[in-house]
Amino acid sequence: MQVFPVWSSPRRAAFRVAALCTVAAVAGCGPRHEAAPEGDGPRIVSFLPSGTETLFALGLGDCVVGRSRFCDFPPEAAALPVVGDLFAANEDALAALRPTHAVLGRADAPQAALLRALGCEIVEGRAETAADVLAFADTLGELFPGRTNGLANARTRWREAMEKISHPERAEVFAPARLASGVSRLESHAESAENAERVLVVVSHAPGRFGAAFAAGEGTYLDELLRAAGLSNALAGVKGYPSLDPDRIAALAPDLLIDVHPDGDPPDEDAWSYLQGVRAVTIRDTAALRPGPRLPEALERFRGLVRGDRGR
């Protein structure tokens, strides 16, 4: 599991992990699920923010009865009872809700043993790339075949939204996009590195100037968004989320630095002032940061940075 250091507060570090959903999956395995207990209908709790968004996007929101404290979208999800966070679960809250299914980043997550003891089926939703999100949606379709009408309608809306990615002027607030088309578009829109602006995406950093930072390398969802938006990752050839000291950051000499800052605390405006000639922007919401159904909105946000839009 990808965990970023607690530099300023446990809340900030945990939120970055939740917002980015950098949950390592079991090597060589896609989404999977285990035998479910019988019941009158699914009662789902989700500990994975991107998983929660996908559940609602597929029309399964009425089955979701609880969430982690980081599952804050859509608004209907934010109104649900909190049953834990990324690493722990509230046994009393779970017992009261009687869930039949639990969405976790991986089947051996810290909460899994308690959930199994309560008779809950574990649904693993890997969330590191756009393809992972599509695979998770397919898993949900297999688990809940009785709700295929909702799934079919959602996929129709996905297809319409994904087609609008090529026409930003017609982009609309996310109505779930067809992730299969989105994955294909992420692959086909990669631009030549010779002409693309070189970008460093920082996902967590120490407070103040000259602090160390973690940034998104190749093979990450943020790297996919960069390439799809016609940008080049300054960490080409580096996998995952490496730790970078100030000297390494300066040596990379990116044209643009994107500081993802999804929590409520104000960003440190002085953090990157030591980088000469580098345009730095801050993205403060989670829409562009979670591998999930808001993929079209995320891609438009990154394309806006190509046009010189300010982060927000």
Predicted regions and their residues:
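C-terminal motif of bacterial Sec signal peptides marking the signal peptidase cleavage site
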Residues: 26-28
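A short, structured surface patch at a secondary-structure boundary
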Residues: 42-114, 231-237, 270
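Bacterial N-terminal signal peptides that target proteins for export
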Residues: 3-19
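A ligand-binding cleft/hinge motif common to bilobed small-molecule-binding domains
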Residues: 109-117, 256-274
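Extracytoplasmic substrate-binding proteins
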Residues: 33-43, 110-210, 232-236, 244, ...
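Proline-aspartate-enriched helix->loop->beta-strand connector
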Residues: 88-104, 245-262
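Alpha-helical, coiled-coil/dimerization segments enriched in small aliphatic residues
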Residues: 69-73, 155, 213-240
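Short secondary-structure boundary segments
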Residues: 48, 106, 203-205, 238-241, ...
